[in-house]
Amino acid sequence: MKNFYYFILILLFFNEVCYSLKDGEIKLHLIPHSHCDSGWTSTMNEYYMGQVKSIISSMVQSLNVESNPPRKFVWSEIGFLEQWWDDMPIEIKNDFIKHVKNDRIEFVNGGWVMNDEACASLESVIRQLSNGHKFIREKFGKQPESGWQIDPFGHSSLTPTLQAQFGYKHVVLNRIHYELKKKFKEEKNLQFKWRGSPEGVGPKSDILAHVFDDFYTSPPHMSFDGYNFLAYGLPRLTMEMIELARNRSVFYKSPHVLIPMGGDFAFKNAYKSFEQMDQLVASINGQHANGESNVICQYSTLADFFSDTINWHNENKVSFNYYDSDFFPYADDSNTYWTGYYTSRPLLKGYERHVSSKLRSAEILSALQNDEKYYPNQLLNASKQVSILQHHDAISGTSKKHVVQDYFSRLQKADILVSEQSEKLLASALSQHSPTKLDIIDIGGSLNFPKNNDAISFILFNQLSWSKEELISIKVQSVGDHGESLNSPTNNACPYVLAQEDFLNEIEIDCSPRSDFKSDQSDDHKEFIQIDFPAKLKPFSSKLYYLKRKSNPNKSNWVLPKTNHFNSIENSIYTANLDENYLIKSLKSKSSRHGGGANQITEINQQLLTYSDIGGAYIFRTNKQVFQPPRQVYSTFTYIGKFYQEAQSILQDTHQISNRNGYYYYYGNNQQQQQQQQTISTFNYNSIKLINTGNEMIDKKINFNFHIRGINGTTTINRFTTDIDNNRELYSDNGLEMMHRKSISSQSVEVGRETQSYYPTINSVYIESQSTGKRFVCNNDRSRGVSSQGQGCLEMALHRSLTYEDGKGLEIPAIDESSINARFECYLDEVPSNSQQSNGGGGGDDIRKQSINYQHKFQIYQGQDSSYMSSKSFMLKPLPEFIHILSMERSGPRSIKLRIHNIENNNQSPITFDLNGLFSFIKSIKSIKEYNLSLINRFVDNNIDNIISSHRSIVGKNLFPIKDTPTRFNPINTKQTKITLYPSEIKAIEITYH
């Protein structure tokens, strides 16, 4: 009897699946899924062992049951899947492969994780997606066609731009501003063609977006991991689902309704869940077959759902509307803006950026080998660890403390792997013989003299594909072999001399006695000597230097700290006027190209300020005006060297902070418990540095460094208040392009609403005045929140430590008392003439190039044997100015893979260049293959012309004109070595060579 019952269910199901919808009928597409965070309240490994391993196994076993209606499942997080794959016997793996082949398991997103969209960089998003696609291609021969960004806290326009170029045609979104979601539902615009790069690559960034009308979890009472089925009974659940279908169908133009079935770590008992869902599906379809309902139901993948939806739109000639911006900030009510996580856990954000840059450099070094040696496995392992950090509860800083520590451990593991491999790779690239090992010197590290050795050698390496100049700052030990101090202020000369290539080629340096800053002002300061000198390196090149102890060097400037107060510091570009705290008051320009003209004064008025923050890891929420804590200047130092002038101050602030011995919650306007207050003093280190090398592109940038710690219950910001008439608008980047950001009002912002005008920035932010043509730009060392809270104002959030919990799942406050060095560089510039238009924001090419320079500093390696070290250039000719090799890695003994990016202004023409004769290690090019951005899957036409669009904006007017170039599919001619790139376009290729 039971078998007969299931036979009837199968007949009913297949009858409905093949059924062609009639007018007035609704088709429910149930999408079974399990959203498995790669760390959040538990670590990734804790989640895997405790839940995810059994979820995947249970799901596969449930799909093996053929006696039920055809079950389907979508899976996203490939990092978890690799762990599971390595644990499983071949029989279960074969079951999984079978279900993928039969389209019953679909990979959606297919990244290593589901990446955050506000804090992850362009390079890191590409990396984590590529690692996931590599696993999918190698194990299953498939590639994803749909994005599944259901949990990030707001959506970036970088998402459609990248995913479309990874071969995706559709993406599912969830968290958009509550007012927008309401508007889209009312106007049936929850589905639209999303163009991520309207001024850049245009059609190449188009994707069909679907926004959940509610949330990514199962509808009420429809989660079948628990007891809902028994509690409510099949008849009631059937009627509720039919009513749900009718209610939700009014939000869409087509009668196809997507219903997510699952949620966080759902399907722990997939067999039970599917058995109950089978009965629900059969009951719904049975009522339809009996003429009692207009709703039919099936399990679907995203491919099924989008295919049916697009076909209906085409058959009925109903177009999708259009959107060409992003979805920041995200809010779920008027008092809850998810703008805090842009800045939360800044130490983690900064360390991830540092390790990612090192990893990129190591991958490039792997391609530069001349003896066919490369180390792909170690670098791939490091790449996977870095990819985990892109998860939307990792780089966002929204995990519990022990999970954050796990992320640090993963980064440290990757850091060690990358250091070990890059030391070998550079040594191998410089010599075909058996070189001794090089030691990479990280930021904050120092060069070390072996005992009884008066000279050491080191190498600088430029990992960028254009020539670059920097002012190099290197720490050197301050104690001699016999324990004598080398940096005593009573010394009258620098104890070191620096030479390039050999000791006959001595170069001029600034040499200064220093000590590390300790935020607690303890006495255990580490003393050192700092060597500063300008260095210019060719693209992908190394340069050899020698440092030697010498008592009276001719070209070493001994720069002693001055303790008397300076009102200003200067270089060839600016005079920077300082206030009593050694923060900038104004800039006087010495050049007509900076600040509006020679002798023109631009008000800057820098402040280090504090918000009282009653939000949590996700939510930035204030309850009083931003303020400066009571402050004293503890000490000041000024260094006046040949190549720089630097003003340093130590500021002692007094804070009234909340007692952190209890946990407190804030919901809406109600504080559940009054916190006890205590008074503490903190010491903040501030440095402002003007560089004087004679290179205008370097010297125009003012270098800032704040050494600060998190203060409980606060967000610490740096604010510039300028005389630039910006109408409280600013531009911040999404990792690829600058985005125009409007503030909520042109008037002064009332308390509690400041956070509504906060936006994320990955690398750069600026304000400008179209009337005066003046622009103020800042490049950042990590992602952070930025805003313009008043006319001429630009502020950047630097640190947060929370004593309230915002009710978003962490359950405990995100207390973060870590000390960080928050670095950024800022400069005055002119608004390019080609941006004198309604949208503004031109000149993004130079801003992008300068931010890349800031992100990827020269790397320093100390050598043990200089006979195997040399200055060497691996590029034989320069690329055009704005052509950037985004990534490069060895793919085989005689092949390399590259992503090449045209970062030029979107108003410019395409650029053509020749790969032939570009690299010193390539004698001749044998063949070229083109891939999509994954560098895993070939570049094929993922045409979406069948998705008809009105090009009518779903929000106001279109922000940008509709452009049709470059075309979505524009393959290169692989029979020749010339490449053409449109502005903002990225091409991914593999070169096989002789």
From Swiss-Prot:
Its EC number is 3.2.1.24. GO terms for molecular function: alpha-mannosidase activity; carbohydrate binding; metal ion binding. Zn(2+) binds at residues 35, 37, 151, 392. It comes from the Eukaryota. Glycans are attached at residues 247, 381, 554, 712, 932. Binds 1 zinc ion per subunit. Residues 1-20 form the signal peptide. One of its GO terms (cellular component) is extracellular region. It holds the Pfam family Glyco_hydro_38N. Its cofactor is Zn(2+). Keywords: Glycoprotein, Glycosidase, Hydrolase, Metal-binding, Secreted, Signal, Zinc. InterPro entries: Gal_mutarotase_sf_dom (IPR011013), Glyco_hydro/deAcase_b/a-brl (IPR011330), Glyco_hydro_38_C (IPR011682), Glyco_hydro_38_cen (IPR015341), Glyco_hydro_38_cen_sf (IPR037094), Glyco_hydro_38_N (IPR000602), Glyco_hydro_38_N_sf (IPR027291), Glyco_hydro_57/38_cen_sf (IPR028995). It catalyses: Hydrolysis of terminal, non-reducing alpha-D-mannose residues in alpha-D-mannosides. SMART domains: Alpha-mann_mid (SM00872). One of its GO terms (biological process) is mannose metabolic process. It is found in: Secreted. The keyword Zinc applies. The active site is at 151 (nucleophile). Belongs to the glycosyl hydrolase 38 family. This is Alpha-mannosidase F. It comes from Dictyostelium discoideum.
